[in-house]
Amino acid sequence: MRPPVPSAPLALWVLGCFSLLLWLWALCTACHRKRAQRQQTGLQDSLVPVEMPLLRQTHLCSLSKSDTRLHELHRGPRSSIAPRPASMDLLHPRWLEMSRGSTRSQVPNSAFPPRQLPRAPPAAPATAPSTSSEATYSNVGLAAIPRASLAASPVVWAGTQLTISCARLGPGAEYACIQKHKGTEQGCQELQQKAKVIPATQMDVLYSRVCKPKRRDPRPVTDQLNLQDGRTSLPLGSDVEYEAINLRGQDMKQGPLENVYESIKEMGL
């Protein structure tokens, strides 16, 4: 028979295996973290060498370190804002500028007067008409006339306002004025006065083509027909009168005479 195996070494073996697995897990985790850190540092190292040459390029840098320091030491007056490096002063020394300024001050002002740019004349107001030689149709007195009043009474504006503007303007602006003769103005005024004096009933009679007949004495009503003269007399009403009109001339006696009756209404009777 075999001797019994103690249980203590079996428990130690299980505990040793568990600790070994735990140590392996910690080791793998540490390696993974370290690898991730190395990758990040590698990316940073690869980006820095790319950015540094870009920053060191001369066309991207306005001032180098030496120029910036010299510019701070030899800074000009505070009014000058131009960020010019101090090394450029070697090309344009200050003593040369000072000598030029002194020579310019010594030159007499009468020999070389300062040049001035031509200035435009002040703009005239829109309401005032222009009387200069360069006056055009757009700025000669016509803009002051309102359109509504011109449409309401064109004769009055043409006779008064435009003639006044022509009188104010000089002889050089006659081409932009409207001149009216006195005869036409008088004729228009007479027509307006007559139109005001004549009543409406007389105006209707004036413009009608049928002349108003004279009032005749009442005659007896007859129904006789006179064939020799070629005229007929019919009974007359109170408001309507029939009158025979001979269309043919008196010297023409050929053929029967035609009688045409025209009704004429008396107005105002």
From Swiss-Prot:
GO BP, one annotated term: B cell receptor signaling pathway
The organism of origin for this protein: Mus musculus
Region Interaction with CSK: start-end pairs: 175-178, 207-210
Lipid attachment in record (S-palmitoyl cysteine): C28, C31
Modified residues (Phosphotyrosine): Y137, Y175, Y207, Y242, Y261
Subunit structure, interactors included: When phosphorylated in response to TCR stimulation and/or CD4 costimulation, interacts with LCK, CSK, FYN, PTPN11/SHP2, GRB2, PIK3R1 and GRAP2. When phosphorylated in response to BCR activation, interacts with LYN, PIK3R1, PLCG2 and GRB2.
Positions where Phosphoserine occurs in the chain: S263
Interaction with LCK, PLCG2 and PIK3R1: annotated span: 261-264
Entry keyword set: Adaptive immunity, Cell membrane, Immunity, Lipoprotein, Membrane, Palmitate, Phosphoprotein, Signal-anchor, Transmembrane, Transmembrane helix
Region (Interaction with LCK and PIK3R1): 242-245
Annotated TM spans: 8-28
Record note on modification: Palmitoylation of Cys-28 and Cys-31 is required for raft targeting.
Effect of C31S: Abolishes palmitoylation and lipid raft localization
Compartment(s) of residence: Cell membrane
Membrane topology: Single-pass type III membrane protein
Protein's name in the database: Lck-interacting transmembrane adapter 1
Annotated spans, Interaction with GRB2: 137-140
Segments forming a coiled coil: none
InterPro entries per UniProt: Lime1
Function: Involved in BCR (B-cell antigen receptor)-mediated signaling in B-cells and TCR (T-cell antigen receptor)-mediated T-cell signaling in T-cells. In absence of TCR signaling, may be involved in CD4-mediated inhibition of T-cell activation. Couples activation of these receptors and their associated kinases with distal intracellular events such as calcium mobilization or MAPK activation through the recruitment of PLCG2, GRB2, GRAP2, and other signaling molecules.
